[in-house]
Every structure is written in C-alpha cells, then in structure tokens.
C-alpha cells in the first residue's frame, strides 16, 4: 500500500502544474511537444436547454483571501494518473456503453453535442484531500445528463457499478444508484463557460455530484461497462480505497492563514464548507475552546460548497481556531481525526494565530 500511496501523493502534489515538475524525469521534451496538440477552442458549446437560475446575490462573499465561489479553470486542482495529458480529438472521440445492458451503444462527439445540454454548478473533491487541504474546486459544468443515455442502453437487473475507462485505459468504478437517482450526473464538455481544458478531460469527462473523484470524475472518458462490484474492482479499490465514496461533511478556514500575526480588534475569519448533494446548514467557529455561529453566504445548489465568515473580537495573545459544519440532513462534521484512507479524511481544520 505504501508504494501506491507514494505514487498518489506524487500525482496530487503535481496539482495544477499538470506534472510539469516531472518532465525532467519522464521525458520533458515529449511532455512539452505533445501537450497542446489538440486545441479545445475549436469546440463550440451548445447553448443549454435550461440555464441555471442566477446565483443568489449573497452567494459569493467579497472577503480578501477567501476562496472565490467559482474556481478559475487555471487554478482548479488536478489529480490523475496521466503523466502526459492525453490529446483526444473530438473528431475521433467515441463513448462505448456495454456490459450488463440490453442495447450496447457507441456515441460520437457530434452525436453527444446534439443531445440536450444543461449547466450545473458542482464542487469536486479529491479523496486525497487532507483536512484543510486544497484539492477541491467549484465550477459551472456544461454537459448532457448521463442517466438518459444509460436508460436508452437498458441497464440490466443486478448491475451495480459503471466501470469508466479513459483513453489510456485507466478505470474508475462508480455505483449505478447515485448516477441514476436524479442528481445532475454529467458527461461534461464545458467548464466555467469554456470547452473543457485538456488537463481536465477534453473533450468529455464525467462529473457526479456528491462522490469523491476517484470513483466518479473520469476524465478523457471513452468506455463505460455496466457490471457488478463482485466481478471487477476498479483501480483505486484494488489499492484499498472504498467502493462507494460519498463525500463527507467538511469545512476549511481560508483566512486568516495558519501562523498569522494579527492586530487586535475585529478580525474576519472566513472559509468554505461542503457536503455535496446534501448541502450546508450551519458552520461554527471555535476560538480557544468556545464555539460561535458563523454567518453563511447564500446556497447555490446542494452540490456546491458554501462560503462562511465570523467576525472575531480578537484579543492579544496566542489563539487556536477551529471550524465545523453541519449538513442539511442535520448530521454534524465529525471531530474524529482520521487520514484519507479508505474513504476520506475527517477532523476539524485547526490553525494557530497570534494577536499582537
């Protein structure tokens, strides 16, 4: 398990640099020469049949240092096993749906783009995310719903998971139930109003609200096989991670930063909280052992994170700050400290600051 974790940590650490740091060790000239062969700008996004409702005015707070509500594409985290970003031409892209279905099918990119398109805001999260970490991002995704395609294929009784494969053969396994339960599970072609960036799955990727990316966020997807959990263990499941991966209720302090030296007086503590497909009901901030209710920004959808803030009357001295959230089902974030394996880290994000 250690070797696999080391590899995962390496890939996570590459982040938005798209593994450029590894170029010297794996053929930097090859990485640079092939990375931009396909130009996503040639794709023209189809207008969605129904546009999302406008964001509530108070959804995005204007607090310096707070994560923006929408994560810019260039800053969106990247975690995958591709040391060289795949170059997939829309003209040659196809998606095969097969396995435990009555009507196996193959769909081309042109056929996909003729299907009804929607836009939906979804916060994606990596299971490798440590408490308080940065491998989470929110975007407006454009695509077609996956469920109607699967209904057309005719899912057979007993099918439990969809094994999704990318152009390089990497596989992820997502449970059938959450994909078919009415949530906006997408074959996405757009991100924040632009065609998918290459590093985030161009021309087509999967985005399923409420599940960690290692089971749901297949980039460069070209194959979906309906099967059972007993018949196949996907890549990360073989390495000790859970088959089902609902995202846990979590929260993070964005400002102030850990170790900050702050002036006495009114200090704004702010951050984000998330419980995708359940939504955030409340956030509390702990200062030196006492809990205080934070103010929440507006909720976009239950599939996105929610900004929050608390104005703290800071007094001189060292202080410890913590945060916890409660989701809309009434379940609070757990205080139990646990690492990411096998299904996501837990505990309260905690930082130390000093007030002069």
Region locations from a protein language model:
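Structured, non-membrane catalytic/scaffold regions adjacent to prosthetic-group chemistry
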Residues: 29-356
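Hydrophobic alpha-helical membrane-insertion segments, chiefly the h-region
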Residues: 21-29
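N-terminal secretory signal peptides and thylakoid transit peptides that target proteins
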Residues: 2-18
């Amino acid at each position: 398990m250690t070797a696999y974790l080391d590899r995962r940590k390496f890939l996570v650490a590459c982040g938005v640099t798209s593994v450029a740091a590894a170029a010297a060790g794996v053929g930097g000239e090859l990485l640079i020469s092939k990375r931009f062969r396909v130009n996503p700008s040639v794709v023209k996004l189809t207008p969605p049949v129904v546009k999302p409702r406008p964001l509530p005015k108070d959804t995005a707070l204007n607090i310096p240092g707070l994560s923006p509500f929408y994560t810019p594409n260039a800053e969106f985290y990247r975690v995958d096993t591709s040391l060289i970003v795949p170059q997939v031409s829309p003209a040659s892209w196809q998606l095969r749906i097969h396995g435990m279905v009555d009507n196996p099918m193959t769909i081309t990119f042109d056929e996909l783009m003729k299907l009804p398109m929607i836009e939906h805001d979804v916060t994606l999260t990596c299971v490798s995310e440590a408490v308080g970490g940065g491998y989470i991002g929110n975007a407006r995704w454009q695509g077609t719903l996956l469920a109607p395609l699967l209904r057309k294929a005719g899912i057979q009784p007993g099918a439990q998971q969809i094994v999704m494969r990318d152009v390089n053969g990497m596989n992820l396994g997502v449970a059938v139930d959450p994909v078919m339960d009415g949530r906006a599970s997408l074959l996405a072609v757009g991100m924040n109003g632009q065609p998918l960036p290459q590093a985030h799955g161009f021309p087509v990727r999967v985005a399923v609200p409420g599940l960690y990316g290692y089971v749901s966020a297949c980039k460069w997807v070209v194959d979906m096989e309906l099967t059972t959990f007993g018949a196949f263990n996907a890549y990360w499941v073989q390495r000790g991670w859970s088959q089902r991966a609902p995202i846990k209720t979590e929260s993070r302090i964005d400002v102030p930063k850990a170790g900050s030296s702050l002036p006495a007086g009114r200090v704004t503590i702010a951050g984000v909280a998330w419980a995708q497909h359940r939504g955030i009901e409340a956030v509390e901030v702990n200062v030196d052992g006492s809990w205080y209710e934070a103010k929440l920004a507006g909720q976009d959808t239950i599939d996105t994170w929610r900004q929050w803030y608390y104005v703290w009357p800071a007094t001189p001295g060292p202080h410890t700050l913590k945060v916890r959230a409660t989701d809309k089902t009434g379940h609070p974030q757990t205080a139990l400290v646990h690492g990411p394996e096998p299904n996501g880290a837990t505990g309260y994000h905690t930082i130390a600051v000093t007030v002069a």
